[in-house]
Amino acid sequence: MDQYIRAIESQYIRKDFPEFRPGDTVRVYVKVREGNRERTQAFEGIVIKIRGGGVGKTFTVRRIGAGGIGVERIFPFASPAVEKVQVLRKGKVRRAKLYYVRNIRGKIRIKERRD
């Protein structure tokens, strides 16, 4: 049964994403429909979590918006609305889930990873 599910899911899994981890700063380009026209919107921030596997795999990106208010967006890896992902900076962290970043005020400093 599991092999059948994996075979069907493999059709929908995207391989064009770069490899990134929690702590990395990424820019996600999302297709947005406004009425009858479509445009691309960029969302830049720190990856605070990657969860799931297969078609249900998602990643959460957090940034500080206008007025110092934190904004988080969850993007599915398999979503056709996500056009592309750019890794701007590789961060060095010791956790898989960076929930503590939510409690930090101001700009977040994460050390850069050297690979």
Swiss-Prot record:
PANTHER family: LARGE RIBOSOMAL SUBUNIT PROTEIN BL19M, RIBOSOMAL PROTEIN L19. GO terms for biological process: translation. This is Large ribosomal subunit protein bL19. It comes from Kosmotoga olearia (strain ATCC BAA-1733 / DSM 21960 / TBF 19.5.1). This protein is located at the 30S-50S ribosomal subunit interface and may play a role in the structure and function of the aminoacyl-tRNA binding site. Keywords: Ribonucleoprotein, Ribosomal protein. The gene is rplS. InterPro entries: Ribosomal_bL19, Ribosomal_bL19_sf, Translation_prot_SH3-like_sf. One of its GO terms (molecular function) is structural constituent of ribosome. Belongs to the bacterial ribosomal protein bL19 family. One of its GO terms (cellular component) is cytosolic large ribosomal subunit. It comes from the Bacteria.
